[in-house]
């Protein structure tokens, strides 16, 4: 994880220094739209699985979320997800679908458990290729945020990649898991229409404070699957729609086979969650779909260029 984080930092610095023009050439709207859409749609089975574990609670959470967004404006409307999740949690408690034993056993104060990382050079070649997929996913997230907010955040792409790398490196040194940009957060932004970075500064500070209270962590871990299923149906769906919005805004012409294939193949790979295993490393639908979008687009363009040159050589 540390090596992946360092690689992301290097890529982020290069992008920040060199600029993002080459990214626009490598990731045109049809590619970024496909990547963003497949990120959201790839997570649909997770929403379905959670929903089926508590359909009543999930349905109530989903209906309350949609109703609150439709009926209320201002602060209440922006907190629709929070209110719906809390209401679903309370209903699950009433129905006895929440295991409170871990909450009762957890202390009020305590430090998180840190682990000392072990470095194994043999596994580095397996992890570093994942950087390609992470870069594509991260850039797709940045573009979706820009599309959603109507702001040109492309110049910040390098910083986003570097920050992701720094966070992953620090997490690796502490024995934690890799960090990345999350589609769920983009879905929350789309649903609440709160785009201020100040909200994330505050959220980060609050999260650090709450991490010192194991009881809070246990309560969050005990959130019933039904509640998560109801909420993520909306959140994941919104991320998928953002990808489609990128196509519409940039007037992607789907009469062209190039654009058809670039969108169709990655979407199927992502939605079906294709997997490819190399030793102990597993590439899932999002990573494979992102790579497929790049390979299909640039591969077909290369073949089209070669086709145009062949008659000239023959002449």
Spans of features found by a protein language model:
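Hydrophobic, membrane-embedded alpha-helices of multi-pass small-molecule transporters
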Residues: 57-61, 79-80, 95, 112-141, ...
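Juxtamembrane interface elements at the cytosolic ends of transmembrane helices
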Residues: 63-68, 79, 99-104, 132-149, ...
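Short alpha-helical transmembrane interface motifs in multi-pass membrane proteins
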Residues: 4, 124-129, 167-171, 226-229
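Membrane-embedded alpha-helical modules
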Residues: 2-99, 209-311
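Intrinsically disordered, low-complexity non-transmembrane regions of multi-pass membrane transporters
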Residues: 100-113, 147-150, 160, 299-315
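Membrane-embedded helical hairpins/re-entrant loop segments and their flanking transmembrane helices
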Residues: 128-197, 313
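Membrane-interfacial loop-to-helix junctions in multi-pass transporters
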Residues: 29-32, 56, 115-124, 153-160, ...
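N-terminal glycine-/lysine-enriched basic segments
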Residues: 203-206
């Amino acid at each position: 994880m540390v090596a992946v984080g360092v690689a992301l930092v290097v890529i982020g610095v290069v992008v920040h220094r060199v600029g993002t023009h080459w990214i626009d050439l490598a990731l045109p709207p049809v590619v970024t739209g496909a990547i963003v859409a497949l990120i959201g749609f790839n997570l649909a089975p997770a929403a379905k699985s959670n929903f089926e574990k508590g359909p009543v609670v999930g349905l109530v959470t989903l209906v309350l979320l949609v109703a609150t967004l439709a009926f209320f404006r201002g602060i209440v409307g922006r907190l629709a997800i929070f209110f719906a999740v809390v209401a679903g949690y309370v209903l699950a408690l009433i129905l006895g679908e929440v295991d409170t034993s871990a909450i009762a056993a957890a202390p009020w104060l305590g430090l998180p458990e840190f682990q000392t990382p072990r470095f194994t050079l043999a596994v580095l070649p397996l992890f570093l290729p994942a950087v390609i997929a992470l870069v594509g996913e991260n850039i797709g997230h940045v573009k979706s945020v820009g599309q959603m907010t109507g702001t040109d955040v492309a110049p910040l792409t390098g910083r986003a990649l570097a920050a992701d790398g720094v966070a992953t490196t620090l997490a690796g040194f502490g024995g934690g898991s890799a960090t990345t940009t999350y589609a769920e957060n983009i879905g929350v932004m789309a649903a609440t229409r709160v785009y201020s970075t100040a909200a994330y500064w505050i959220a980060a500070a609050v999260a650090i404070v709450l991490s010192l209270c194991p009881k809070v962590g246990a309560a969050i871990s005990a959130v019933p699957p039904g509640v998560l299923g109801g909420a993520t149906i909306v959140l994941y769906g919104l991320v998928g729609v953002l990808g489609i919005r990128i196509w519409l805004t940039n007037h992607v012409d789907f009469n062209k086979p190039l654009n058809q294939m670039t969108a169709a193949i990655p979407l199927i790979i992502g939605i079906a969650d294709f997997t490819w295993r190399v030793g102990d490393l597993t590439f899932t639908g999002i990573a494979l779909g992102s790579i497929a979008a790049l390979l299909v687009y640039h591969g077909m363009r290369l073949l089209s260029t070669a086709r145009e040159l062949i008659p000239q050589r023959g002449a």
